[in-house]
């Protein structure tokens, strides 16, 4: 299902790009029609979903159309809340050929090149600077966790940001390129819970908050305000909360300074290099991790043939970083 949503989002973005509208001004009726067309085309590309020959297939198709319409609505509201402009969609690493951030020189004169795809890249530009926001669409409820980054389990978004920044430095050599944020958007249909009946407006606000992306945002006020210009207290668009004195609540926000983004990036580069060296050395040890809620075996497609018992003590505990 995740692939269908990804394809539909790419098609919707292209349709909007080729129209007379953009994310900031597209009328609701046009947005809904474009979204429906994009999803219908995406479904048609998957034979198992293309023909509604059963009631189950017909229901699933109808539900996917509804979730996708809601997804495009929420993404549009998130864009309109700020000044970041969606610029690029489904950018493959092949399009970033020659970027040093994607190539690692290993021992024995071996070069390792990374493969991947950036779902969406937004920019906020002024006379001297360009800030970048990287969005990764997820059909599962992925949360950004610095502990997982430290353990080498969640390196993807940091790599995407590094590659995007290098690309823009080459395109705009006279401007400062800054990390704005790395965010996961969960494609979902959340159930709203409330002790009292909600008005239509309250339900809409609650839905936006439930669909708020998760990730890491630059703590610079000019940057996070460019993602959500008018919020007070908790933002409905980014994982940031402001205290009454106007300062960021670090306990309730996921933020990092530009300098801290750079430190995280250097650490991720080190981890990737270490992984590359281990792969080249032939290290294929069965050494999965374990956290409080899952192990690396939980969603592994090879679990049926691996033979690893999740109860074995070999599983490394995923604990707080020192």
For every predicted segment, state its role.
Residues 1-322:
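Structural signature of nuclease core domains in nucleic-acid processing machines
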């Amino acid at each position: 299902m995740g692939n269908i949503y990804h394809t539909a989002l790419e098609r919707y973005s292209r349709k909007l790009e080729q129209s007379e509208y953009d994310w900031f001004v597209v009328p609701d009726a046009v947005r809904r029609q474009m979204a429906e067309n994009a999803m219908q085309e995406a479904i048609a590309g998957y034979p198992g979903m293309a023909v509604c020959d059963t009631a189950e297939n017909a229901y699933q198709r109808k539900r996917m159309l509804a979730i996708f319409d809601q997804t495009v609505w929420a993404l549009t509201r998130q864009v309109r809340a700020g000044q970041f402009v969606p610029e690029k969609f489904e950018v493959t690493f092949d399009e970033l050929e020659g970027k040093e951030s994607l190539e690692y020189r290993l021992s024995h004169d071996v070069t390792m090149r990374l493969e991947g795809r950036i779902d969406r890249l937004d920019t906020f530009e002024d006379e001297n600077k360009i800030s970048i926001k990287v969005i990764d669409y997820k059909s599962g409820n992925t949360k950004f966790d610095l502990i997982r980054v430290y353990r080498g389990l969640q390196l993807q978004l940091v790599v995407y940001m590094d590659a995007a920044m290098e690309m823009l430095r080459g395109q705009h050599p006279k401007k400062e390129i800054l990390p704005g944020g790395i965010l996961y958007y969960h494609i979902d249909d959340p159930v709203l819970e409330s002790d009292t009946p909600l008005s239509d407006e309250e339900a809409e606000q609650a839905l936006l908050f439930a669909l708020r992306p998760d990730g890491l945002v630059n703590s610079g006020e000019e940057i996070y305000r460019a993602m959500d210009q008018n919020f007070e207290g908790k933002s409905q668009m980014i994982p940031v909360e402001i205290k009454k004195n106007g300062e960021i609540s670090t306990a309730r926000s996921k933020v990092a300074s530009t300098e801290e983004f750079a430190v995280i990036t250097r650490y991720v580069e080190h981890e990737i290099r270490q992984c590359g060296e281990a792969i080249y050395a032939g290290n294929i040890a069965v050494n999965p991790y374990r956290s409080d809620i899952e192990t690396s075996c939980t969603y592994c497609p090879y679990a049926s043939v691996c033979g690893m018992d999740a109860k074995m003590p070999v599983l490394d505990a995923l604990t707080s970083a020192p």
